[in-house]
């Protein structure tokens, strides 16, 4: 498997610092993943498969998916986060391929995955490459903040890191949308499950 990336030392150090300062705050999977797994992933792939976890950090989603019997590739810019993921995985580490690199210029390789997922990460320019990484018949799971988050406490405020209303469904153009929701439940988010046609 080969990926092509660029480098961003400032961003890497920012995330390294976040993981060092709060190492135990990154482990509970977002509730969207277990729900999407039972409603969409499991019916399509009852015997498991491979997944790509974008900006997977300390491994909360990759480890959960590995617990369900999946093989997962976790990519994150933070060496600290990825090392925490490796340690947090324990014996499940043999089912997770850990990659430290910048995602801002990600290029999909010939390797495709049954599931590609990203939680609270937004780099619009690489969205087409993320879609390419989904195998035919596979799923894209995505959840991140919307512009409404700028008015709430916590979370990102930079508009470059926030979705416009309806934008996530537009970014998934060419995929069949199975689930889409924008909500204000403590955080302003959009979530999507979309399938690449066979």
Regions found by a protein language model. Name each.
Residues 122-134:
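A short, conserved alpha-helix within the catalytic core of class I
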Residues 91-103:
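Conserved SAM-binding strand-loop segment of SAM-dependent methyltransferases
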Residues 138-148:
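Conserved beta-strand signature within the Rossmann-like core of class I S-adenosyl-L-methionine
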Residues 85-86:
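Conserved SAM-binding loop
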Residues 78-80:
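Conserved SAM/SAH-binding beta-strand->alpha-helix loop
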Residues 108-115:
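A short acidic, Gly/Pro-enriched loop at the edge of an enzyme's catalytic core
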Residues 1-46, 48-57:
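Conserved class I S-adenosyl-L-methionine
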């Amino acid at each position: 498997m080969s990926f092509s990336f660029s480098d961003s030392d400032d961003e890497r150090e920012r995330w390294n610092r976040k993981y060092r300062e709060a190492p135990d705050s990154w482990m509970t999977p977002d509730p969207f993943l277990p729900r999407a797994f039972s409603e969409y992933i499991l019916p399509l792939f009852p015997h498991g498969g491979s997944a790509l976890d974008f900006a997977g950090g300390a491994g909360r989603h990759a480890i959960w998916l590995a617990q369900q019997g999946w093989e997962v590739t976790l990519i994150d810019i933070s060496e600290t986060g990825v090392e925490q993921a490796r340690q947090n995985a324990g014996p499940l580490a043999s089912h997770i391929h850990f990659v430290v690199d910048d995602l801002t210029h990600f290029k999909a390789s010939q390797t495709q995955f049954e599931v590609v997922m990203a939680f609270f990460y937004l780099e619009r320019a690489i969205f087409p490459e993320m879609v390419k990484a989904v195998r035919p018949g596979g799923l894209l799971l995505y959840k991140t903040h919307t512009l409404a988050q700028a008015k709430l406490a916590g979370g990102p405020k930079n508009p470059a890191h926030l979705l416009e209303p309806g934008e996530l469904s537009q970014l998934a153009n060419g995929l069949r949308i199975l689930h889409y929701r924008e909500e204000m439940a403590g955080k302003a988010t959009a979530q999507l499950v979309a399938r690449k046609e066979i």
